[in-house]
Amino acid sequence: KFVVFSFEYMTRNEYLHTERFEFEGGGSIDGLKVVYHTSENGWRKGDTRKVIWICHALTANSDAEDWWPELVGKGKFFDTEKYFVICVNMLGSSYGSSGPASVNPETGKPFYFDFPLVTVRDIVRANILVRKHLGIDRIDLMVGGSIGGFQSVEWAVMEPETIRNLALIACSCRATPWLTAWEESQRMALE
């Protein structure tokens, strides 16, 4: 059976941070850019819709309607008309948010290996910048898969008064030594 999905209920947005962004592991950048997708009807002050914040997995992007078409969109489980649905592109990825392929304003060339090491806490801090920019005071449901799940856990620790509920997929609250070694071997393979 061939299924055609219509992707028209999420809108791409960009947030440009005007202050220097300091990374947890050291280093900083000016002009941090964070790309995100939201329900077509944006968030306004006094909005009463429930907020669903999706933290994507490593290889996805902020267009959750594109990679999760069965769940995100008008009339779907994460109904973009009934709820305010948002997904922020992960800091350091290649889908628009600042990362190694971004141009270093000091050199005029891509950062590549000079881009600061990005931690989960850095990713969450970039998400929090977008949350504050939009004026969102509460997140009714945060959904995160894989590294998005780790972001969700970290965010719940950083802002427990903001996050009401978590739905975590393929993640845990801590990494075992085996998992740490496995991830390091993957990182080494990429280098």
Model-assigned labels for residue ranges:
Residues 9-191:
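Ligand-binding pocket scaffold of soluble enzyme catalytic domains
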Residues 2-9:
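Aromatic (phenylalanine/tyrosine) cluster motif
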